[in-house]
Structures are given as structure tokens and as C-alpha cells.
Amino acid sequence: MDTLPDLYGTVGDSLDYFLEHSLQPQRDWKEEGKDAWERIERFFREKCFCDELLLDQEVRVLKVVKGGSSGKGTALNHRSDQDMILFLSCFSSFKQQARDRKAVIDFIKSKLIHCRKSLAYNITVRQHKEGKRTPRSLTLEIQSRKSNDIICMDILPAYNALGSFSRDCKPEPEIYENLIRCKGYPGDFSPSFAELQRHFVKSRPVKLKNLLRLVKFWHLKYLRHKYRRAVLPSKYALELLTIYAWEMGTDSSDNFNLDEGFVAVMELLRDYQDICIYWTKYYDFQNEVVRNFLKEQLKGDRPIILDPADPTNNLGRRGKWELVAKEATYCLLQLCCVTADRWNVQVSIAHYLRGARDVQVTVKQTGREEWILLTNPHSPIRKLKAKIKKRMNLCGELRISFQEPGGERQPLSGRKTLSDYGIFSKVNIRVMETFPPEIQVFVRYPGGQNKPFAIDPDATILSLWEKIEEDGGPCTEDWVLLFEGEELDDDDNLAELQIKDCDTIQLSRVS
């Protein structure tokens, strides 16, 4: 493919034809890519590690996974990038992989150079630029036997973290705990999750894969060609952003127009400073270590595009996004983007402010049935309060609070957002209606649960006991209330005890 076809000069409603005749891999190219893959794979399985010790041990190839565009089903014609992930028995942990990867890559390189004549292809081992970090792959340039094109293949030795992979199940959260605690360079261990990355893309409809091809072609011809020396966001980052645009703009439908989808992606790239994208398909907020890590990740500077398979891999942190936005803005003025219709992704970004997904909020109030609403984690909490007040027909001052597992109950300020409190997933909130001069106090039960109560600041502790009993709490016989470690008498006055708004009082059983 010496001369790349002109996307910008193609009318939007002709993009299907353009893709089919210019970008779809042709049979001869696919067959040659397949043959090269099979020969290299056979070399690793049957020759590379046979009859020789590596790291003082016999090394076995546990499995070989095809990644990259070819593995995901989004390759371009005569532009093939194949990732061959070698899961090796010599790696028993992420830390061991980090320590021994260079030795393994050097060994593979020497064996390939020694045996490349037997592979029936002209193979060149590309030299990586010297840098602070050890390369995680070995790049091969394989000369096509039927054209002047080059098949690029990255060989990535990896730790088999997933074990027996099941595409329909979430990995055990302990796998991600180990990944996070390893504290490696962000995304450095992503090859261990290549099967998840591949399935995340490969399982999508054919029409979406065609849109992915179109976006990747744009990245190749108009970004990489124009900004050859710049560090640009990866193709994988653009793939994930395209999938997000499709999910939001079509509600994951396979019935859409390519030009509308392409325009939606360009608009997202133009507004990259609003992007915060993540999925909970393979990891979520249930595990404490993972939850705390994700909260910190999602508080970072935009754009944020978390790898759905590897939470340490924020694909938005790397590359000159301003150059991408500049080219996307120019692209939107070209023939390929002249379309009468638009996807609703921009509206979604206004609704899912800053491009983040809505949080499911379960609203609870004593004496009333709980209910659920969706809200944006970056939207002011005062807007959330207004929705609750209207839905529940409340007329007093609305006080809302939440409690992390094992933590103290915290009031939610209307001047802040849920994201300010690190809330990006499902959350239960307690609603309390107060009338001046009432304050809100929290009572902590022995099991760790905190409940809010509205009470006059001049009321006695006995009045608070009455409210606790009305709420279904224990009676005073076998229990005491403590504040800052001191037992409270029934006749004590809250104001005299200097108990202020949002203070916590401990409920404790008499020993």
C-alpha cells in the first residue's frame, strides 16, 4: 500500500464503500500474515527454549496469544501489526517478570538471529531506542514474500497472571491487588491481560470494528504522517474512545452509519480535556485495594482512558493530545464529516459531565422506602439534593451523608461533587430533613453503621435516646452513649457538651 487513499476527500455516505475497497484486509494479505504467525509461533513452541536452560531452569511456553490489530479483528489491509504474547513458565509473579524480562528478551533475540534462516522469511530484529526503562518487547520486521510491505510483530514475554482464562467471568480481584501492589510502571504488565483486551474489542459487532478501522486509518495517515516526531496517543487509546462513543451514541446498537460514528469520535477527540472513560467489566470498586486505586486514578488530569483490562494503564496520560484535537478539528471540516445527523455523544458528555459514567445512588430515609437515581460524579451535589428534595417532596433543609465500609459517616457538601469524595460507583446515601435550629448528629452503632439524626442543639441526651428508639434502635437499659470517650448522662445538654453539627456519638453496650 504505497499510496494511502484519501479519506478527507471521500463523501460521508460513501465511507462504507471506501472502507470495503481500501481498508479491509484482502485474502492474500491475511493468508501471508497467518503463515508468518504460524511459523514464528512454531519456532517458540518447538525450538526456542528446547535443550537449553534459561534463568537456570527449563522454560516452557504455557500459551501463545495473538494481540494487536490482527488479534482483535481490526487490522488494515497491508498494515498488519501483530502482538505475540508468550506466557512463559519462568515467570511466577509480576515482580519476577520485571526482574527477569530483559534476560528473557535477550535470549529470544539471540535464538531468533541464529535460527531466522529456517523460518522462510527475511526477518529483521528492530533495535529499540535506549531509554531509562527496559523494553518489554522484541520487535520483528518480517518482509512479505508477495509485496514490498512489512509485517510488524512484537514478541512480548509475560507472566500468566490469569491462569485458565474464562471470557465470561471477572478475574479474581486478588490478581489486580497483586498488580497494584507491585507498583510497576503504568501499563507495564498489560501483556498479562492481553486475552481480556482482545476479547473486549473482538466481541464487538462487525460494523463497530469497521469504524475502528476507519479511526485507525485516520491515526495512521493524518496524525502519524503529519507529526512524525511527536509522541502521540496510542491506537489502543483511540480504539477505546471509539467504543465509548459507540456505546453512548447508539446504546450499543450495530445499526448505525459510519459517517455519524466517525464524526462523533472526532468531536470527542476535539474535546479531549473533558474525557474520563472507564469500564467495570473485568475489575470494579468492590475490592478495597482496587477501589482506592481506581479513585485516585479517576481524580487525575483529563483525559482519562482506563484500560478495561488493566487499571494501572491510563492511556490518556501519554501523548500530545492537543495535536490530536487540532487534526480532529480540521477533519470535522472535511467531506467525510459532512453529515446531516449527529450521535448523541456530545449530549451524553453534557449529561455525563466530563465524559464520566453515571453513579447509581440509593437514597435512604428512615420511615420511607429506598429508591435509586443516577447522577454524574462530577456534577455539583446541590443538583443531586434538588432532585431528591423534589422527588421526596421535602420542605426543610436537606442533609445527605454517606459512609465508606469501615469508615465514619461523612456529610456531603452541596458545594462539592461526588468525585471530590472519591465516589465513582454505587453508593448508599442517607437523607435527613432538618428545620432551624436543628443540627445533624451521627450515631455510630457497634456493627460500624452510622445513622444521622436531626435534633435541636439545646435538646438533652434523653431526647436523642427517644429518636434512636423510634428508629428501631436499642433501649437505654443495656446501652450507653459516648462522645469523645466520655459517657453521656440523660440530662446532659448537647450544647453544653459542645456537640456540634455532624459530630459522631458512639452507641456502646454496657459491659
From Swiss-Prot:
Amino-acid positions noted as binding ATP in the UniProt annotation, renumbered to this chain: S69, R213, K216
EC class: transferase
EC number from the UniProt entry: 2.7.7.84
InterPro entries: 2-5-oligoAdlate_synth_1_dom2/C, 2-5OAS_C_CS, 2-5OAS_N_CS, NT_2-5OAS_ClassI-CCAase, NT_sf, Ubiquitin-like_dom, Ubiquitin-like_domsf
Residues bound to Mg(2+): D81, D83, D154
Residue ranges crossing the lipid bilayer per the database entry: none
Keyword Flavoprotein appears in the UniProt entry: no
Cofactor annotation: Mg(2+)
Record text on activity regulation: Produced as a latent enzyme which is activated by dsRNA generated during the course of viral infection. The dsRNA activator must be at least 15 nucleotides long, and no modification of the 2'-hydroxyl group is tolerated. ssRNA or dsDNA do not act as activators.
GO biological process: antiviral innate immune response; interleukin-27-mediated signaling pathway; negative regulation of viral genome replication; response to virus; type I interferon-mediated signaling pathway
Domain Ubiquitin-like: 439-477
Reactions catalysed according to its record: 3 ATP = 5'-triphosphoadenylyl-(2'->5')-adenylyl-(2'->5')-adenosine + 2 diphosphate
Record keywords: Antiviral defense, ATP-binding, Immunity, Innate immunity, Magnesium, Metal-binding, Nucleotide-binding, Nucleotidyltransferase, RNA-binding, Transferase
Annotated GO MF terms: 2'-5'-oligoadenylate synthetase activity; ATP binding; double-stranded RNA binding; metal ion binding
Highest rank taxon of the organism: Eukaryota
Gene Ontology CC: cytosol; membrane; nucleoplasm
General function of this protein: Interferon-induced, dsRNA-activated antiviral enzyme which plays a critical role in cellular innate antiviral response. Synthesizes oligomers of 2'-5'-oligoadenylates (2-5A) from ATP which then bind to the inactive monomeric form of ribonuclease L (RNase L) leading to its dimerization and subsequent activation. Activation of RNase L leads to degradation of cellular as well as viral RNA, resulting in the inhibition of protein synthesis, thus terminating viral replication.
PANTHER family reported in the protein's UniProt record: 2'-5'-OLIGOADENYLATE SYNTHASE-LIKE PROTEIN 2 (PTHR11258:SF7), 2-5 OLIGOADENYLATE SYNTHETASE (PTHR11258)
Family membership noted in the UniProt record: Belongs to the 2-5A synthase family.
Protein name: 2'-5'-oligoadenylate synthase-like protein 2
Organism: Rattus norvegicus
Classification of source organism: Eukaryota, Metazoa, Chordata, Craniata, Vertebrata
Encoding gene (name): Oasl2
